[in-house]
Regions:
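Nucleotide and nucleotide-moiety/phosphate-recognizing core
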Residues: 1-119, 126-141, 149-154, 169-202
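Extracellular serine-dependent O-acyl
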Residues: 145
Length: 205
């Protein structure tokens, strides 16, 4: 199938920190979701493009084929906005942005998707809002992945800790669920459908 006329390329940005030492940490669950989505799209390779690792793909949907970019900023979490701004300004055409990030306000395994709003204490998302807002009045839809309450552990330490072994099955399940919802959204292009799917109660709960 060919890309339908007028279709906007999707830009899905997963947030995390580069480097093996951060690969399994809670803050990097956004990277995990993008890796899972890339596998669903046919093991698309991530190649360095400016300040991000980017994979290209195309998804078939009811209206035809839609191009998509999957991006993992390599600027470290707190400077994610710089990488995203580069991708938006260097694009040959309009991009529909959606950000995937961790959220310690949500229970482990929960998803929440919104069209817009505040950063909610997520520094990578805050950086994106800061840098993208200067481009236009663009909304920044975001899919938050719950990583659990830090309790008495300072949040800045908690997010850089790896998931516990007992938590891993729940993490793998929510990562796969998020990737599935994103795959569906890429095909249909319906953000309301994505929001409804992500905000529905977990059928396994």
């Amino acid at each position: 199938m060919r890309q339908s006329d007028g279709a906007t390329t999707a830009l899905v940005v997963g947030l995390g920190n580069p480097g093996d030492e951060y690969a399994a940490t809670r803050h990097n669950v956004g990277f995990e979701v993008l890796d899972a989505l890339a596998r669903r799209l046919g093991e698309r390779p991530f190649l360095l493009r400016g300040r991000s690792l980017v994979a290209r793909a195309a998804v078939d949907g009811p209206a035809g084929q839609r191009a998509c970019l999957l991006a993992k900023p390599q600027t470290f979490m707190n400077n994610s906005g710089r990488a995203v701004r580069d991708l938006l300004t260097e694009a040959e055409g309009p991009l529909e942005l959606l950000v995937v990030c961790d959220d310690f306000h949500l229970p482990l395994g929960r998803l929440r998707c919104r069209r817009s709003g505040s950063a909610g204490g997520q520094n990578g998302l805050a950086s994106i809002l800061e840098h993208v807002a200067s481009l236009d009045d663009r909304q920044v839809p975001r899919l938050r992945v719950g990583i659990g309450d830090p309790g008495r552990v300072p949040a800045e330490q908690y997010v850089l800790r790896p998931f516990k072994r007992a938590e891993r099955p729940a993490v793998d399940a929510v990562v796969d669920r998020a990737a599935g919802h994103l795959h569906d959204w890429l095909g249909h292009g319906d953000l309301d459908r994505l929001i409804e799917a992500c905000n529905a109660p977990d059928p396994q709960a």
